[in-house]
Amino acid sequence: MIVQNIKKIIDRPQNKNRLYIRNLVKEEIQNYILNFVYNDSVFQNLIFTGGTCLRKLYGLDRLSEDLDFDYNFNFSIDNFALKVKNYFYSQLTYQKVSTKVSGNKQTVFIKLPLFKELNVYQDRTPEDVFVRCDFSKQISKEYGLNTGMITAGTFKVIVEAYDLETLFANKITAFLRRSFYKGKFQKLPFKGRDVYDLFWFLQISSKSGYHLKPNNKRLLSLIKERSMDQIKQDVKRKIALVDPKYVYKDVLPLVESGQFLNQFLEIFNKDRYGDVIYD
């Protein structure tokens, strides 16, 4: 079942960008994992968060490479790795899957050699497809939840997720606190997808008459600043550091159209958001 569904995705005539195709394949695998998680008596208590949550439950218009969950119960990542592999084995009859738990016990890597099976990219050696599931223990009591139904491929799944106000606060926190490495040594102060997602939140907020606002109590508890005014200043300073070419490079594998992404960056360059956080 999995192999046939992945082949349909790869064979779509409009799919030309290899990195975008890879992330479409990852999304299909994510669908199976989400079906497993929220039909399991223990793991259904995981709180869905991150970019995939924004896409599946709230309509974010980009792909997401990973699955992110928070937990507030006695969660065993080793048990998760074992049970998700057994799910692929028994329920999906796919025996070539393997799992690995990271050394810090916060991530499960799920590996499937699908491109090798389908002989994709004959001009080079196909790589395995990895989907990572990241798990974090809740560190703030300031949050709201939303129980909702998502469409995950052919599955309809009821998920426990953060509400938009909480996810808005999470995204601002990620934008302010997250750095990553371009190549081996060059450290960048932002991820392009965080910039893109903040813009998306602002569009949703605008359409709601600015009734959608980040959960300020959560922001203050996560960032440990003295006031919202200080957080606003931090956001403005970091936005000034954003280089559009790095946003383009990071987000391009996650959207279908490079032309659309260029249009987004033109708009971004014109106003650099204005006020990101509303009183």
Regions found by a protein language model. Give the residues of each.
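Glycine-rich beta-strand-to-loop/alpha-helix junction loops that act as flexible
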Residues: T49-T52
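Anion-coordinating catalytic cores for phosphoryl-, nucleotidyl-, and glycosidic chemistry
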Residues: S64
